[in-house]
């Protein structure tokens, strides 16, 4: 559904505008089941844009896989969506599904998940959310982030103990490793099938292989 273009600024006298529609997150907050939450998430082919670790924009067409992983680089939950879907739109279903499968303590997420609804949902499930701050064009928040970075460097320089949150947040890299395994070791870097069901099936087999492979490593 295409959104009508609106003129910038305040509406003219007598001009009426549609009320702001509730976000996907605010709708999901009121839902009980994962199936209901995912009914709001598109799986159609779309265009995705993200910023890589070097600060460059990457653009791709298709979909993306949202993964929840635990220690040992073991994927627990994976949800496929359109490439254009914002990561935060799948946060609540990921937390809910993963909580059904395993007991865990921390929800570690980057700045793309910085939302009060996600924090509250995580706490409701008995977890501690550790989510990076998204400055959202706020100079005050940027200053706060910079101050935290400066303090972190000082603590490292003097070899002083830091907040355990920093240690836990750094463990978020296990999801990146799962993505790496999926692309480099299990043939999911480029998928030429058409249709969300076929693509999601290929990715699901890849996730299953990683889960078995990493679990065997822990046993042996």
Model region roles, listed by residue range:
Residues 93-96, 142-143, 148, 198-200, ...:
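Short, charged/polar low-complexity linear motifs in solvent-exposed/disordered segments
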Residues 1-2, 117, 140-142, 201-204:
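Short, solvent-exposed polar/charged micro-motifs at secondary-structure junctions
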Residues 111-184:
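Helix-centered, glycine/charged polyanion-binding patches within enzymatic domains
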């Amino acid at each position: 559904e295409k959104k009508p273009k609106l003129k910038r600024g305040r509406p003219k006298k007598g001009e009426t505008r549609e009320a702001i529609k509730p976000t996907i997150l605010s709708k999901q907050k009121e839902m009980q089941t994962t199936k209901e939450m995912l009914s709001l998430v598109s799986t159609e082919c779309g265009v995705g844009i993200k910023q890589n670790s070097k600060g460059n924009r990457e653009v791709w067409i298709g979909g993306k896989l949202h993964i929840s992983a635990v220690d040992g680089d073991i994927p627990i939950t994976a949800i496929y969506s359109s490439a254009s879907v914002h990561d935060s739109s799948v946060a609540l279903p990921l937390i809910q599904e993963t909580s059904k499968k395993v007991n865990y303590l921390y929800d570690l997420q980057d700045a793309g998940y910085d939302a009060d609804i996600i924090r509250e949902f995580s706490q409701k499930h008995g977890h501690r959310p550790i989510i990076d701050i998204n400055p959202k064009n706020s100079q005050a928040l940027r200053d706060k982030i910079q101050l935290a970075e400066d303090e972190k460097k000082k603590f490292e320089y003097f070899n002083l103990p830091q907040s355990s949150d920093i240690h836990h947040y750094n463990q978020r890299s296990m999801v990146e490793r799962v993505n790496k395994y999926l692309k480099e070791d299990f043939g999911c870097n480029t998928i030429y099938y058409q249709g969300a069901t076929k693509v999601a099936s290929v990715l699901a087999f890849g996730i299953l292989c990683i889960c078995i492979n990493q679990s065997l490593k822990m046993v042996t």
